[in-house]
Each structure stands twice: as C-alpha cells, then as structure tokens.
Amino acid sequence: LHLLSRRQRQMCIRDSLNPRLVFLPIMTILGTLAGCAIAGAFMSQRSPLDCMAVGAGFGYYSLSSIFITEYKGPELGTIALLSNIMREIIALLCAPLLVKYFGKLAPISVGGATTMDTTLPIITRYSGKEFVIISIFHGFVVDFSVPFLVTFLCSISF
C-alpha cells in the first residue's frame, strides 16, 4: 500500500470495506461447524460435537488443542492439533488452486484464524492486495471466536 498514492490508498481501503464482506468470517465459522457436524455424523468413534470442537480451532492450533486436551483428553487434543496444522498447510499450499476454482475469497475462508498472520502473505499474493484488510478482519474475528466456541462445544454433553 505504501507504493500507492494517497487517493489510490483511500480507494483501496474503501473498496475493501464492502459491507457484505463483514459476513465472511461468520460464514466461515458456520460452514466449518456445519461441515464438521456432518463429518462427525458419519464417524463411529467421535460425536459430531467432538468434531465441531476440533473444527472450531479454525487453524489456531496453539490454543484450541490445549483447550481440547484439557476438556476431552490427549487423543482428541492431538487430533485437533493435526487438524489445525493441516488447515494452515492447505491454505498455504492450495491458495492458487482455491483462487482459480473458487474465487479470491476462498483462501481467506480456508485459512480460518491464520489469515491475519501466517497465511496473509500467500493470500495477498494470490487474491490481491485489495483483500489484505478483509483478510486481517476475517482472521481477527475467527481468531477471537476460538476460545469461546471450543470451550462451549467441549462443555456440552449429551
């Protein structure tokens, strides 16, 4: 952004603040939880709630895996750690394919909580500089939701 004129920067920021993009982190959260619940329905070893708790890490492996280990045990905590690391690796390695086949917002959604830090350079490279602000906003909102969703989903018992 520093190479752009002041007017170009203002236009870039204004265009990035599309009100519809505010819903991207919400849709990422809902889509991830729905996908995990559906996957959990087909697993005999794990409940849909366990799968949703793992998915609610959204790539924030250093925090979610610790919470899940404390609430549900080391086995599910390890699954959460590996699942979140894989989410980040997929976002990093598949960003060009995600943009090509699903659009410029796809790597942001796939990146989950990592979109404001580790996956931001890759997202910027393949989605474009105009997606930096929405990527940071997305990462912040999703990142902020992790401790609340993980602890909530781990504390529910049927």
Predicted regions located by residue number:
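Alpha-helical membrane segments and immediately flanking helix-loop junctions
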Residues: 49-89, 104-137
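Transmembrane alpha-helix/helix-exit interface in multi-pass inner-membrane proteins
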Residues: 33-53
